[in-house]
Structure formats: structure tokens, C-alpha cells
Amino acid sequence: MADVNKVVLAYSGGLDTSVILKWLQDTYNCEVVTFTADLGQGEEVEPARAKAQAMGVKEIYIDDLREEFVRDFVFPMFRANTVYEGEYLLGTSIARPLIAKRLIEIANETGADAISHGATGKGNDQVRFELGAYALKPGVKVIAPWREWDLLSREKLMDYAEKHAIPIERHGKKKSPYSMDANLLHISYEGGVLEDTWTEHEEDMWKWTVSPENAPDKPQYLELTYRNGDIVALDGVEMTPATVLATLNRIGGEHGIGRLDIVENRYVGMKSRGCYETPGGTIMLRAHRAIESITLDREVAHLKDELMPKYASLIYTGYWWSPERLMLQQMIDASQAHVNGVVRLKLYKGNVIVTGRKSDDSLFDANIATFEEDGGAYNQADAAGFIKLNALRMRIAANKGRSLF
């Protein structure tokens, strides 16, 4: 094994990372620093401290990263109206660069020469964690136990835990049949019956949202205030970024908004089925496009739409800390200088319906757009020359006998 003196482990306190902790201590004979991130996953993170202490860990980091997560990662991503493969709002992907950043910061603070994570060798997360780590600390060692050990089943992990007296919960609570990941932006569900792409997901799988059929029969109206492309208030009440997203999750969930069942293309080459709940993000995406519709120049809006799939792919595949993502982010952020105003939405049985938008920076001119008499604001005769000039190349081709049918 490589010479490792101290390693920072991304630690949840669950079975997998608890086994990894002991495995690192025994296999590398090194000191382990644990790092547990609170990203709004809705679980108690403090029990991870007690478990780490019981296993002899002396340096334990438990960080509340909810505000940083939404402010510096989720909000910048939504300024681009980011969607991967037409549907996925990147709830898992966008959390990984922050975890990688904090792993490296802690490594620098503690003098650690390595980091470790619990991502498997089949998934995208190993790539996301490690690309971020290498970008931020080129010489760091990365230990990925799932690519090294032979503990490739839950049974083997349990046996290892029992053999080494690793504290694990043994109560009667039924284990979820799905592999789940959660943060303030979403919950994901994979594995189990979802590995059959024809099998419908079960209703009791969903944790944040009611079914649209069981959502309230009365719609709810909601006003979102934007400043430079970010939401700063709901119904006139100013909120921090994390509070905005948490509130939208609650409201959206009550109305059955944000459920998704997709098959996506993983970076490592395979297709994977995932179900996602992203109520707040679904609302944010619809509202942001609405406020941009009146504040962005047409060509800027179209260019953003052309660049968005590339930007989404960079996030999905782990290139958040790459120079190309940073370049695109500067362009996206520059486009948001005038994205200010208020969007009014109607939430009803899984639907997010835009019912109004207004802004002091609006480019919508009712005097020009009206179907009524415009008082000379727009000379319709000008359209003839505009059309002829734009048709010129096609007329030339037709005159040359180039058939189009």
C-alpha cells in the first residue's frame, strides 16, 4: 500500500463509511480524520461524531454547509436553467464539488496527505469527487476502497463490521429497498425494483411529495422576487438561499410537484434508472425562465440555451472546478445583471403554472407588442424589406435550380 500518514474521510456514519474508516486504519495504518457534511439531507449528523469517537478518531469535522451549498452551487447552476438530458436537475451532481472542496480544505488544515470517499467503482460520484480533489490539490492521494477491497456485498460489509466490533444499528426498522441520496435540492432513489425499467415505482417510495392525485384541490399562488437571477424573497418575505429552497421544497411537496422517473447516461458508460424528488428546484426552474423571458435580450437568451447542455454536462461529469465551467459561469452570471423582478406562480396538482411576471428591467413593450392601434410605435411596412433580405439566400438558390423537394 502507498505510504499514507493521515487521510480525510467523507463520513456519513452509516455502514459503508464506518467499515471504510476501520479498513483505512488497518490497511494503511494511518490516522483518519472524519468529515460529515450537513447539506440538508434531513438526517441527524451528530450521531456520526459519536461513532467516529468510538472508533478512535481524534479529529472530527461536522459542518453545516446548507447556506454555502445553495448560495454558491445551487443558485449559480439555476441561473443557467440547467437540466441534464432534458430532465434531470442535477441534485446529486451539484453537491459533490462542495464536498470535494471541503475535503481538500480539511486536508490542508490538518496536514493530511490523502482523502477517501465511499463512492463505488460503478458510479459517477467517484469521478466527481476525484476530479474536484485533483483540481484543488494536484498532489493529493485519493483512496477509493470500493476499487480496492473485496467487500462487494452488504453481507460482507456486515460480517466485517461484526468481526471488528464496528458500531452499527441493529434495530427492527425496515431497510429501504432503494439506494437513496438526499440534500436540500433533492432526494434520489436507485436500485431495487427500479433496476427493471418496466416496473412502476411504488407510491410509498416518495418522501417529500404527495401524489398529484392526492394534492389539494385548491391551487396555491406564490410570488418569487429575483435579484440578479437569484431568488431573494417569497411572497415579499426576504429569505436566505437555503431558507428559500427549503420553503419551496415544502410548498412544492404539498402540491405533488417535482417527481421524476428517468433513465440517464452515466459518465462511466452505463445507463441507470433513477427516481428523483426536486419540488423546490422544479419551481425555481419554471420561475427563472419566466423572469428571464421579459428581462433577457433575445440573442442572449438563445445563446444561453445553446450553452446550457454543455454546462449541464460539465456539472454531471464532475468538471465543476474546471476552467471551462468557470468561463461559462462568468458568461452566465454576466447575463443575469438585469434579471430582476417578480414572478407569480400557481401550484396545482403537480403543475407549476406561470400567471404573471413583472420587472423594472423588462424589455417587454406593450405599446409595440399590442394587437391594437400602436400610435406609430411599430411600422408594419418595415417588415417587407426585413423578410426579403432574410429570404435572399433562398431565392438565389431557387433561381439556380436547387430543388428543395
Curated annotation (Swiss-Prot):
GO-annotated biological processes: argininosuccinate metabolic process; L-arginine biosynthetic process; urea cycle
UniProt catalytic activity: L-citrulline + L-aspartate + ATP = 2-(N(omega)-L-arginino)succinate + AMP + diphosphate + H(+)
A Pfam family recorded for this sequence: Arginosuc_syn_C
SUPFAM superfamilies to which the protein is assigned, alphabetical: Adenine nucleotide alpha hydrolases-like, Argininosuccinate synthetase, C-terminal domain
UniProt: L-aspartate binding residues: 120, 124-125
Keywords on record: Amino-acid biosynthesis, Arginine biosynthesis, ATP-binding, Cytoplasm, Ligase, Nucleotide-binding
Compartment list: Cytoplasm
Pathway: Amino-acid biosynthesis; L-arginine biosynthesis; L-arginine from L-ornithine and carbamoyl phosphate: step 2/3
Cited NCBIfam families: argG, PRK00509.1
Subunit architecture: Homotetramer.
Protein name per UniProt: Argininosuccinate synthase
